[in-house]
Amino acid sequence: MSTFKRELELFLLALTFFTRIPVPVKLDYSGEGLNRASRYFGLVGTLVGLIAALVFYLTQFIFPASVAVVLAMIATVLLTGGFHEDGLADTADGFGGAFERERKLEIMKDSRVGSYGSLALMLALLLKFQLLSELALYSVSSVAGGLVLGHTLSRAFAASIIFNHTYVREDAESKAKPLAQSMHWDEVLFLVLSAGVICLLLTGVGATLVILVTLFVARSLLARWQSRHIGGYTGDTLGACQQILELVVYLVLLLLWSQS
C-alpha cells in the first residue's frame, strides 16, 4: 500500500470516528488503527469547522446573525452526532455526582443524563452561542474563521492529552467506541503543528502565539483536573475537554478582536 493511500485511510478513519460522514471504503476500527489515526483528529475538526462556517456564511444572508450562529451550531451537532457534547454531559454527571473514582466511572457509563450533565451542556451551548454572536458583531469572517479554529484547535489539544496521560477505562461494558489509547512523538507533533499552521494562516503570528499558549495552559489544567478525579482520561473526558477548549478559543478570539 502506498504511503498516500495509507495516510488517506487513517484520515478517513479519524473522520468516521468523529463524524457521521460516510466513507466508501472498509476501515480498521481497532484501537491500534485509531492510535495511528490520532494525528488527523485536528484536521477532522478543520473539516467540521469549514462546514459550520459555510452554513453560517450562507444563512446570514437570509437570517439575523444570531440565527445563523444557531444553525451553524446545529450543523456541527448533526455532523458529529453530538459526540463531544455527550462526553461533556457524562463527565459532568460523573465528576459532580460521586466522590469515589469507580463510582464516577460507573455514572459516566450510564446513557442517561443527570442534573449536572444537563446544566453543563446547557451552559456550554449558551456560552458558545453568546461568544459566536459577539464575534458576529465584528465581521462575518470572524465567526467563520472562529468556527474553523475552534473545532480544529480544540480537537488537537484535547487529543494531545492521549500522548502523556493514562486511559483508565478497561472494562468490557463501556458504552464508548474503541478509542485511541496511545500516541507517538511524530503523531502528536503532526497533530499540534498542523493545527498551529491553520491558526497561523487565519490569524497571524501574534494572535497564534496568544491562542496556542492559552490553549496549552488550559489543556494542562484540564488534564490535571481529570487525572485528579479518575487518574487519567476516558473518551468522555476527552469530549468534555474538546468542548471546554473550543469555548476557550472563542473567548480568546473575542478578546483579541476587542483589542484590535
UniProtKB/Swiss-Prot annotation:
Domain of life: Bacteria
InterPro entries reported for this sequence: CobS (IPR003805)
EC number: 2.7.8.26
Pathway membership, UniProt: Cofactor biosynthesis; adenosylcobalamin biosynthesis; adenosylcobalamin from cob(II)yrinate a,c-diamide: step 7/7
Molecular function per GO: adenosylcobinamide-GDP ribazoletransferase activity; cobalamin 5'-phosphate synthase activity
Membrane spanning residue stretches: 43-63, 64-84, 117-137, 143-163, 197-217, 237-257
Chief localization: membrane
Example of a GO cellular component annotation carried by this entry: plasma membrane
Cofactor (UniProt): Mg(2+)
Localization per Swiss-Prot or TrEMBL: Cell inner membrane
Membrane topology note: Multi-pass membrane protein
GO biological process annotation, one example: cobalamin biosynthetic process
Keywords: Cell inner membrane, Cell membrane, Cobalamin biosynthesis, Magnesium, Membrane, Transferase, Transmembrane, Transmembrane helix
Catalytic activity of the protein: alpha-ribazole + adenosylcob(III)inamide-GDP = adenosylcob(III)alamin + GMP + H(+); alpha-ribazole 5'-phosphate + adenosylcob(III)inamide-GDP = adenosylcob(III)alamin 5'-phosphate + GMP + H(+)
Pfam families listed in its UniProt record: CobS
Role according to the record: Joins adenosylcobinamide-GDP and alpha-ribazole to generate adenosylcobalamin (Ado-cobalamin). Also synthesizes adenosylcobalamin 5'-phosphate from adenosylcobinamide-GDP and alpha-ribazole 5'-phosphate.
NCBIfam families: cobS (TIGR00317), PRK00235.1-3 (NF001277)
Family membership noted in the UniProt record: Belongs to the CobS family.
HAMAP family linked to this entry: CobS (MF_00719)
Protein name (record): Adenosylcobinamide-GDP ribazoletransferase
Taxonomic source organism: Shewanella amazonensis (strain ATCC BAA-1098 / SB2B)
Lineage, top ranks: Bacteria, Pseudomonadati, Pseudomonadota, Gammaproteobacteria, Alteromonadales
